[in-house]
Curated annotation (Swiss-Prot):
SUPFAM superfamilies associated with the record: S-adenosyl-L-methionine-dependent methyltransferases (SSF53335)
Protein name: tRNA (guanine-N(7)-)-methyltransferase
Pfam families, A to Z: Methyltransf_4 (PF02390)
Record-linked InterPro entries: SAM-dependent_MTases_sf, Trm8_euk, tRNA_(Gua-N-7)_MeTrfase_Trmb
Listed PROSITE patterns: SAM_MT_TRMB
Length: 303
C-alpha cells in the first residue's frame, strides 16, 4: 500500500500531466485557428480596399509566442523534408511578397536583397522593414513552429498597417536550411546584406562542423553576395565569435570592417537591440560580440 507522501506524488504527477495535456490542447486549437488565417491571408495581394465592415471584422491579432513552443535549436544535417526550388529561376517569390508582384507583367518588381539566416522570431525583420522599404528582406528559419510564428506575425502586421507607408509587404519568412540550399534560392551576387544573429554555438567540438560559419559555407555566402555586400554577425558566446572571426579572416573574399564603421552603421544598431535573443542577453546583463565583413572582388577581377 503506498504511503501518504507517495500518494501525493502520484496525484501531483497526474495533475501535472493533465495540465500539460490541457495546455497542449489550447496550443493546438490556437495554432489551428492561426493556420486557417495563414492560408487565407498569406497569398493576399491587398489590392482591393476592404469595406469599413470588413476592416473592423477581419483584423488579425499578433501571434502569442507561448503557443509556438519549439526546441532552441535544430540539427541542420537532419532530413527535415524541406521544400526548395531546383534553381533561383524556379522560386515563386509572389507568394511571399505579393505586394511587389505586378499583375500586368506577371513579374516581381524587385528581388530579395537582404537575408536574415536563422531569423528566429522575426525581431530583426520587423525592424529592418521601415529602414529599407523598397528592398525585399527574407528570413530563413529551419524550425517549424518558429517559422509559423513569424508568418503569422508578418500577416498580422500587414493587416494592421495595410494603409500606411510602412506596410511590411517587404519582409517574409520561409522554412529553409541555408547550410544546404542557399544557392537554390539566390542568384550569384544577388544579396547586399546577410545577417547571422545569435546562431547555435554548437559547443561540443564534434559539433563544430554544424556551425553556420565555416570555410565551405563562407564560399557559398560569397557566391550569393554582391561585391561590397556585408556579412553581419553577432553572438553572446565569445568562443563562437572568435571562431567566426577566424574563419572570415582566413577567407580571401572577406575583409573586416572597422569599429568606426560599425558604430555608424544603422543595421548594426538594429541588430544589437532588436532581436528577441539579443534583448534576452541585455536583460541578463550578458555581453554581445559583433563582427562585420565586406565582400571583396573575386581575385580575377582585381586586375
Amino acid at each position: 500500500m503506498p504511503k501518504p507522501h507517495q500518494v501525493q506524488v502520484i496525484k501531483d504527477r497526474e495533475t501535472q500531466l493533465r495540465e500539460q495535456q490541457e495546455a497542449e490542447s489550447k496550443r493546438r486549437t490556437y495554432r489551428d485557428v492561426k493556420e486557417e488565417t495563414r492560408k487565407k491571408h498569406k497569398k493576399a495581394h491587398f489590392e482591393a480596399s476592404p469595406t469599413p465592415e470588413e476592416s473592423t471584422s477581419d483584423k488579425i491579432s499578433l501571434p502569442r509566442k507561448r503557443y509556438y513552443r519549439q526546441r532552441a535549436h535544430s540539427n541542420p544535417f537532419s532530413d527535415h523534408r524541406l521544400e526548395y526550388p531546383r534553381s533561383p529561376d524556379d522560386m515563386n517569390w509572389e507568394k511571399l511578397f505579393p505586394g511587389f508582384y505586378d499583375e500586368e507583367t506577371k513579374q516581381m518588381t524587385s528581388s530579395v536583397e537582404i537575408a536574415d539566416v536563422g531569423c528566429g522570431y522575426g525581431g530583426l525583420l520587423t525592424k529592418l522593414a521601415p529602414e529599407f522599404p523598397n528592398s525585399l528582406i527574407l528570413g530563413m528559419e529551419i524550425r517549424v513552429q518558429v517559422t509559423q510564428y513569424v508568418e503569422d506575425r508578418i500577416i498580422a502586421l500587414r493587416n494592421k498597417h495595410e494603409d500606411e507607408d510602412v506596410n511590411f509587404q517587404n519582409i517574409a519568412v520561409l522554412r529553409g536550411n541555408a547550410m544546404k540550399f542557399l544557392p537554390n534560392f539566390f542568384r550569384k551576387g544577388q544579396l547586399s546584406k546577410m545577417f547571422f544573429c545569435f546562431p547555435d554555438p554548437h559547443f561540443k567540438q564534434r559539433k563544430h562542423k554544424a556551425r553556420i560559419i565555416t570555410n565551405t559555407l563562407l564560399s557559398e555566402y560569397a557566391y550569393v553576395l554582391k561585391e561590397g555586400g556585408v556579412v553581419y554577425t553577432i553572438t553572446d558566446v565569445e568562443d563562437l565569435h572568435n571562431w567566426m572571426v577566424k574563419h572570415l579572416e582566413e577567407h580571401p573574399l572577406f575583409e573586416r570592417l572597422s569599429k568606426e564603421w560599425e558604430e555608424q552603421d544603422t543595421c548594426v544598431s538594429i541588430m544589437f537591440n532588436s532581436t528577441e535573443e539579443g534583448q534576452k542577453v541585455t536583460r541578463n546583463k550578458g555581453s554581445k560580440w559583433i563582427a562585420c565583413y565586406r565582400r571583396l572582388p573575386n581575385p580575377e577581377e582585381c586586375v
